A protein has these predicted regions:
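Acidic, Ala/Val/Gly-enriched low-complexity intrinsically disordered segments
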Residues: 5-8, 140-142
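NAD(P)+-binding Rossmann beta1-loop-alpha1 motif at the extreme N-terminus of oxidoreductases
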Residues: 10-63, 70-73, 100
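Rossmann-like NAD(P)(H) cofactor-binding subdomain of soluble oxidoreductases
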Residues: 65, 71, 75-80, 84-166, ...
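Alpha-helix C-terminal capping/helix-to-coil transition sites in glycosyltransferase folds
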Residues: 80-81, 210, 262
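Internal alpha-helical scaffold of NAD(P)-dependent oxidoreductase catalytic cores
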Residues: 93, 104, 129, 136, ...
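NAD(P)-dependent Rossmann-like dehydrogenase/reductase catalytic/cofactor-binding core
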Residues: 218-222, 247-257, 261-351
Length: 351
């Protein structure tokens, strides 16, 4: 029988799985407030380079990492003695990474995911991938064991967090005490980072994943020079699509009006440095999928997520014309102007 753990005020010893931009900036934030923090990376050479330079030049350039931040490639050492694990691995690589690490994960240690995406092969959310790989979903105690899982999501551009610019996020878990402890761990004595709590882990993860597809569409609008009116319409109707599917999948409607829904969508669609929007801008400017991907340093989660969302929309019978249009532009080579025209000429209806 799974033992329920009630959490105290803050976590003290944290390992971050993933050495990308978000993993690095969260390591910076935690070290600045005195939390013992280490980062594990899949690529030993890349991790050693980050440790040597005290800078993640590939994913978070221009920001020196604290000398207190540790780096560990050894699987067992990275996960020994920790009281919280942060999963910061791109969605399509999560299963591979956690299959490697699972034998070193203590059954009492909670895991918070900062990954945004939906797995292509299974259509699972990040917390569901963790539950499946770590064995949470193999018996009737699934719901109880899910109380070890949480999600931290919201409009959190890594470069801005590194510069201590004001930002907000949401800590979501079925276990409210875990959500609150994560909230205090990341927010207490950090005046530029405010974390709220939520128990709608389904809505928080779906909103964080699907907004990346709409961000690609926003970039396409920018690249094609379609104007601000078109972009405003895109964000509004894009959020409506996200909400429709989310509700069908069990999310709470109000989640999509909050930080992880509207908030994250706006930031991702307007930020000049956002990967998904910038990728879309290249597509709108005439590049094909492969060209735009090769020009982008980091993983563009919205590309893979687009495939997953189209499949989910079909499964749940939800109309998602913008997402479908993005899919056709990316994978069927549909010309951007024709895609825009087809969206504008859809059957007229009430809002």
């Amino acid at each position: 029988m799974c033992r329920l753990v009630k959490f105290a005020s803050m976590f003290k010893n944290i390992t971050i799985i993933g050495d990308g931009g978000m993993g690095s900036v969260l390591g910076m934030l935690l070290c600045r407030k005195g939390v013992a923090t280490r980062i594990w990376g899949y690529d030993r050479r890349q991790l050693e380079e980050i440790a040597k330079n005290r800078e993640n030049r590939k994913f978070l350039p221009g920001h020196k990492l604290p000398k207190e931040l540790e780096f560990e490639h050894d699987d067992k050492r990275a996960l020994t003695g920790v009281d919280l694990i942060v999963s910061a691995v791109p969605c399509q690589y999560m299963r591979q990474v956690w299959k490697r690490l699972r034998k070193h994960v203590s059954e009492d240690v909670p895991i918070v995911s900062v990954t945004k995406g939906i797995e292509n092969d299974t259509l699972l959310r990040p917390s569901e991938i963790l539950a499946e790989v770590l064995g949470f979903a193999q018996n009737e105690k699934v719901q109880t064991k899910h109380e070890r899982l949480a999600v931290l999501s919201g409009p959190t551009i890594a470069d801005e967090l590194a510069r201590k610019l004001p930002a907000t996020a949401c800590s979501a878990s079925h276990d409210e005490s875990l959500a609150k402890k994560i909230q205090h761990t990341f927010s207490d004595n950090v005046p530029w980072f405010r974390v709220y709590t939520n128990t709608d882990i389904v809505g928080v993860e779906l909103a964080g994943a699907m907004k990346n597809v709409i961000a690609i569409a926003a970039g396409i609008i920018d690249g094609a020079g379609a104007g601000d009116n078109a972009k405003a319409a895109l964000l509004t109707r894009g959020l409506a699509e996200i909400k429709r599917l989310g509700i069908k999948m069990g999310a709470r409607p109000q989640t999509f009006s909050g930080l992880t829904g509207l908030g994250d969508l706006v930031t991702t669609c307007i930020s000049p440095t956002g990967r998904n929007r910038s990728f879309g801008e290249r597509i709108g400017g005439g590049q094909i999928l492969e060209q735009a991907q090769s020009a982008t340093e980091s993983v563009v989660e919205g590309v893979a997520t687009c495939k997953s969302v189209v499949s989910l929309a079909e499964r749940y019978g939800v109309e998602m014309p913008i997402t479908q249009a993005v899919y056709e532009v990316l994978f069927d080579n549909k010309p951007v102007q024709i895609a825009i025209t087809d969206l504008m000429r859809r059957r007229l209806k009430a809002e």
